[in-house]
Amino acid sequence: MAPFKKLKLLLWKNFVLKKRKTLVTVLETLMPVLFSAIVLYLRLNSMPRNKANTNYPAVDVSLLPVYFHNYPLKSKFQLVYIPSKSETLKAVTEVVEQTFAVDFEVLGFPSVSLFENYIIKDPKSFYVLVGIVFHHDFNSSNEPLPLVVKYDLRFSYVQRNSISPPRHLFFQEDIEGWCTAFLYPPNLSQAPREFSYADGGHPGYNKEGFLAIQHAVDKAIMLHHAPKAALDMFKNLQVSVQRFPSGSHIQDPFLVILQNEFPLLLMLSFICVELIITNSILLEKERKQKEYMYLMGLENWLHWVAWFITFFLSALVTVSGMTVLFCTKMNGVAVFRNSNTTLIFIFLMCFAIATIFFAFMMSTFFQRAHVGTVIGGIVFFFTYLPYMYITFSYHQRTYSQKILSCLFSNVAMAMGVRFISLFEAEGTGIQWRNMGSVWGDFSFTQVLVMLLLDSFLYCLVAFLVESLFPRKIGMPKSWYIFAKCPLWRKKSFPVIPPLLVIGDPEKTSKGDFLQDEPAGHINAIEIQHLYKVFYTGRSKCIAVKDLSMNLYKGQITVLLGHNGAGKTTVCSVLTGLIPPSKGHAYIHGCEISKDMVRIRKNVGWCPQHDILFDNFTVTDHLYFYGQLKGLSHQDCHEKIEEMLHTLGLEDKRNSRSKFLSGGIKRKLAIGIALIAGSKVLILDEPTSGMDSSSRRAIWDLLQQQKGDRTVLLTTHFMDEADLLGDRIAILAKGELQCCGTPSFLKQKYGAGYYMTIIKTPLCDTEKLAKVIYHHIPNAILESRIGEEMIFTLPKKAMPRFEALFADLEQRQTELGISTFGASVTTMEEVFIRVCKLADPSTNVLTEKRPSLRHLPRNHRVPVDRIKCLHSRIFSLSSDQPIRLNTGFSLLCQQFYAMLLKKVAFSRRNWMLVLSVQILLPLVIIMLSLSFFNFKLRKLDNVPLELTLQTYGQTIVPFFIAENSRLDPQLSDNFVKMLVAAGQVPLRIQGSVENFLLKKAKEAPEDFDKLYVVAASFEDVNDHTTVKALFNNQAYHSPSLALALVDNVLFKLLSGANASITTTNYPQPQTAMELSETILYQGPKGHYLVVNFLFGIAFLSSSFSILTVGEKSIKSKNLQFLSGVSMAAFWLSALLWDLISFLVPTLLLVLVFFWYKEEAFAHPQSIPAVVLIMMLYGWAIIPLVYTVSFSFKTPGSGCVKLVAMLTFLSISPVVLVTVTSEKDLGYTELSDTLDHIFLIFPGHCLGMAFSNLYYNFEIKKFCNAKNLSDIDCNDVLEGYVVQKNIYAWESLGIGKYLTALAILGPVYITLLFLTEANAFCALKARLSGFFCKQKLRMLLNVTGAEDEDVLEEAENIKYHLDTLIKKSPLVVKELSKVYKEKVPLLAVNKVSFVVKEKECFGLLGLNGAGKTSIFNMLTREQPITSGDAFVKGFNIRTDMAKVQQWIGYCPEFDALLNFMTGREMLVMHARIRGIPECHIKTCVDMILENLLMCVYADKLVKTYSDGNKRVLSTAIALLGEPTVILLDEPSTGMDPVARRLVWDAVGRVRESGKTIVITSHSMEECEALCTRLAIMVQGQFKCLGSPQHLKSRFGSGYSLQAKVRRKWQQQMLEEFKAFVDLTFPGSSLEDEHQSMVQYYLPGQNLSWAKVFGIMEQAKKDYVLEDYSISQLSLEDIFLSFTRPVPDTKENIQQGQAALDSSLSPSNSRPISSPPSSPPSSPPSSPPSRPPSRPSQPPSRPPSRHPSSPSQPPSRPPSRHPSSPSQPPSEPVLL
């Protein structure tokens, strides 16, 4: 198939699945749009404002600001000069001191280090106003200053007088301190900086006295060099600074939000996309669907390309919507008002592509969906954190640091948003013409390139990890480059050599059991010394050991073995699912480790567990895999129709696989394996879970298809193996025990003949045994299970067989025999003997079982070992049963059991608990604090030389009057000075302010960079005014402008060589000043809280993993059915989760201590932090429990919860925080939103932490400034500092704590109502009002009923009260309708009674309604109509009382994988109320009786399917339940385990219990059931004991014979002719190659006579084996059933066929099958069962057609003790 066609097919698959997963698709598309809507909302609530031209007044610098005159000091300000050895400097400093009216103390320090030490350590350093440090080495104390003077002004680290209100508590608008590390603000805006401050505002050059001191020092220097001239100059000279005028502009407060919040919101919006992508890819990997597609011919690169195109197109839609929201103007504004729409789209699309590839990369590191999804989301968030390090120190970061940071796509995205916001602030927006403009050393173009580079790198990592590293699933790729590396080769074979020694000495002893290879057959599969070893930590498990065997074309090779023998491992190795540890396997000459791509083109695989897409229909699956295997479009449709017909799935063609029953899924899996003509078929238990009719259809299909194929089949059905297997191989503990044809194995392991007897309840076992031993003394009782007894009859006693059979037939009623039959050695017996020989411990264990031991000669059966499962199971020291706990004692015991379950989950999933619940929130906080603290250290104020060269080349406009009174050459000197400094002087005429306004309007983009300072020298009469004009957009322009005019004045006085260079070098930070960082710490608190909320979202969602997991596997339902109370179940979970929540809470406090985060680590704050966290846990955990009801799998639930909690936590906090900004003017809206969002625990948590942080920091700020409470609140402009942090008002946390405390009980109540189905019941009442009439019509449609069924219903109807009192279980007219678009009738007025010591069997095809009955009896599904009573209690109204009387084994194991088998039993024992002192004994006895002791203490996840079924059955039998419901209890068990379970169930029934069982095994029902009913389309078609049904519907015998295949063609026809001649009236019922099945009429024909005839025929016609039995229950079952529409799996789909049941015009009864018996049964039992008018479509054409006079078509009969018996075995019922 061409790659393009495969790609098209994969895209079709992906989009069909996305279309049918509506919620996930909507979430993926809308989550980014929702976050975009938040940004749009903020935009619409922060409208831009127009500002007119503004001129600012000049500021006199000759005097200190007024603040210093009123500053509250206990001592004088200090002026410090350095070095102190110079008297010259002291004189200069004293001149400075005399300049001002403030009283100063002049101090000198010898060195800078001593000065800094004084500042840091001495409390008196607070009074140091400034330190003046001259850069000159004075050789003597009187040495004068040089003409070139350089000095530092060292003001305090934190400004003293710039107490500007912390207007932006949550966003950083300006850098803290003197900002000497920056020339411009990091977030430079088009709007004027500090618009309302004439002196420029922050960093406070005027208010701090810097300009006054600078000018005073400059003036003192001038006086030092030219005392007289300087005095004369300054007499008529006034120097001032003046801010550049502001032109008309738009003041847009949203730009602050855009730059600070938009990157975070954009990242959070795409994190949901990343989670969904990762989860989608990993689900395919976890379910092995990905490897299955590879096996069917898919190339790896196509898989990734298809996924990329799928998510790319989804992202295209999402990004288009986001672009529209961002760029479309609403109310005259848009999020990006000025930017190019195309560029915004390209930018977002590049980020979306990078996110897709990031998800691809993360998916390659994991095998489990929910683990990979959670960790992928965490890592995605972590990659955003470096941006916080970059953004606040952008100008300090090197180009390499920025490039490396942009290797994280989230950082690159945030950098891109930064550029967009900067260009938006300039008023131009990002455009094609300016996208390459370098801002600092980076540009928007580089951001786009880095996003594309990130995508490539992520893709490369994904490719390398996918290709080169070994995985648990799939073959690791071998690249020759890495193959040269010895280390790589070593890793390829991680098996210890001693384990792989070839040539096991024991294999020589097994050679007798390995048949010679057949001659003349093509060897298609060759396995040579194959090993597979699995490692779990330090332990290892050899799954396959030295396996060598061949498989041949045209043959079916059957692989048998006990659960865990290694069958599935062999299949997985051959299909390439897992690599072999050592050895080789060749398929059609290709080695599996090297040529898997070629092999897969010819292999069809049906895995043990269905690998189906939940939302694909049957037709979709066949079409997809057919096309993938290379079928053309036309051929594919033809093959699909053919396959649907062959498999009997026509009516299921449009049903989604998730709604199909297990049997139908197995059919579909077989169809997928067969489609497109695969030459090699590997079928792993293909018929598991199928009903008898379906299984026979598959047998026919496989025999038809095997001609040119090689088939490897595994199974637990021995009859299937005997019938289909050309060769049979048996594995035990991974080793091959025997291999050969069925006849070869029977010959090697045979022990004679087997007689199977099915007893009636009145049978006298000892009397019956005496009769048998009388005829054959050497007979051995092989097993006794329930109603079944199996005797081994030695071959040498064969002459006595006829007399024995005649005697039993004549005395059948007297001896209490229901049916009996005999056969030669069966495959089941072969299997059991092989297992015993391979594992002697099995033999020892089974010898302990009374039903499996040889009966002693006196026929006495010991009874001391059969007490543990009946009513005296708890009577450990006496015959009196103990009392179960009740009331409060039971509640406490259940609470304890549920608490231990939670503890076990945490202990066994410690990695999950440690990573998600503990480390994740702590690591996020630690990383955030590390970034902020690192930033604080790196942003310490550094020395900055205040010269124009610092800002590069600028234009300096100046105005100097002609013939200035200062100096006629002033203009020339000024120009020369600027040129020498590398600047561009520009002399203008007229007003400098007007010139600047004009230039700012002409070129707004370049103005702030080109025009930093200006000067004006004006003469007014005899007075000169010098104005130093500065551009306030530059932090240090005021001092630069002053230095410029001071320097030109100095040059006028002292010559052209004179110059003064001033450096701003802040003092080191004192301990006191550390507390004055609120302006800087505010943004830190905001981002800290946002990051923390994200981590808490993951922590909170993790509490859903167990609850969703229990719900998905129905373990929770089983626990409730066992009797656990709602309070015990949920409150125990809440308690443990709160304890778990306390651990990260306390560790969080330690983290705050470690990082010295006083706001949270202060002694007064610690109780508040703990209280906030615990109340949040109290509220959020019940909410998570409640929401978890909506999820089906833990992985998807965790993903959706993270998305939901992130959105509902961060979005409200951001909205309330942003709208609370004073500049926006929406404080009332903020308060309203704050109160609305109190219903969300995440919002309460975030706001409580925010207020706790800001309140503490503001209090520190005000205390440092010595401000009173009133003054502090005035400065804060509306923020009220709370002395009591628990206050309700602004910056208090009281209302949030109160809300959290109230939300806890509210959500708990909501949880209990949800658990009690209160909302479902309400919905049902409301919807039932409208559809009641339709349902009544549907339920009134009934088919013809059998007389026994009618009699049972009438008896219940008229004697209901009596039956309720006497019978443990009474079901009256129980009905179930699934209310879909087309109402589906699953159960139609079923009535039956089950008495004590009865085992009632429900038989029927897949979907007949059996499980629906169980679901109603256990209240897993609501009852549509009817009633059911258990011990007199109605399950509709008294379910809480009913629970204590019911034991339940569900169809699919509801076991908790993280617990051991023993722990599961102990937990359910506590739930049942067994006293603690008896639990251990009780559990030990059950484990011993079911042979579970070996693996009782192993985790359930290590159990095989069969062992899980044993454990599920044990749970159902535990605790003395009166009514036990077993839904297919023995499915998937090997024969040994199956017999043990039958034995246990039989003895439980004998003890007086009531059992209801469903099964697809007729032998199981024959062995266990005292009464049974056959269901067809929701109705009972017959009801009664097995013997009663056989008496009514059939008589005669069933003959099965198998001709040796060597003489198959020659002798088969002769034998058929012999039967027709010898038994007149016989009919051929079934034929499968060498096996035939006949119906023999019972008139004048004795069983013993038939046996005698067949013994002779065995010799004459070379029969391999044969069996004779009375007519079986399976014959009757098949007569009532045929392939019919499956009701159960179409619950969600609704079948059109049922439409007719709603139509009054349609008179055909919905539940009456075409093959149902007549509505009026005959007055006397018919001589034979009713036949079907036609055979199933899967029957081979070679079979004789059935005629109306013939008996029903019957399958090969089997050993009655097991559904896995060979065809030679009688089926006795």
From Swiss-Prot:
Bias-annotated ranges (Pro residues): 1711-1740, 1763-1773
Segment forming the signal sequence: none
Region (Disordered): 1690-1773
SUPFAM superfamilies with a match to the protein in the record: P-loop containing nucleoside triphosphate hydrolases
Membrane topology: Multi-pass membrane protein
Membrane-crossing segments per the record: 22-42, 262-282, 306-326, 342-362, 372-392, 403-423, 444-464, 912-932, 1088-1108, 1134-1154, 1166-1186, 1198-1218, 1236-1256, 1293-1313
Binding-site positions, ATP: 561-568, 1404-1411
Family recorded in the similarity comment: Belongs to the ABC transporter superfamily. ABCA family.
Enzymatic reactions: cholesterol(in) + ATP + H2O = cholesterol(out) + ADP + phosphate + H(+)
Domain ABC transporter: 525-758, 1369-1602
Post-translational modification: N-glycosylated.
Entry's Gene Ontology molecular function annotations: ABC-type transporter activity; ATP binding; ATP hydrolysis activity; ATPase-coupled transmembrane transporter activity; lipid transporter activity
Bias type Low complexity, positions: 1700-1710
Pfam families linked to this entry: ABC2_membrane_3, ABC_tran, R1_ABCA1
Entry keyword set: ATP-binding, Cytoplasm, Endoplasmic reticulum, Glycoprotein, Lipid metabolism, Lipid transport, Membrane, Nucleotide-binding, Repeat, Transmembrane, Transmembrane helix, Transport
Subcellular location as annotated: Endoplasmic reticulum membrane; Cytoplasm
One CC-aspect GO term: endoplasmic reticulum membrane
GO terms, biological process: lipid transport; neutral lipid metabolic process
Xref: SMART domains: AAA (SM00382)
Name of the protein: ATP-binding cassette sub-family A member 17
Protein purpose: Promotes cholesterol efflux from sperm which renders sperm capable of fertilization. Has also been shown to decrease levels of intracellular esterified neutral lipids including cholesteryl esters, fatty acid esters and triacylglycerols.
Glycosylation sites: N340, N615, N1340
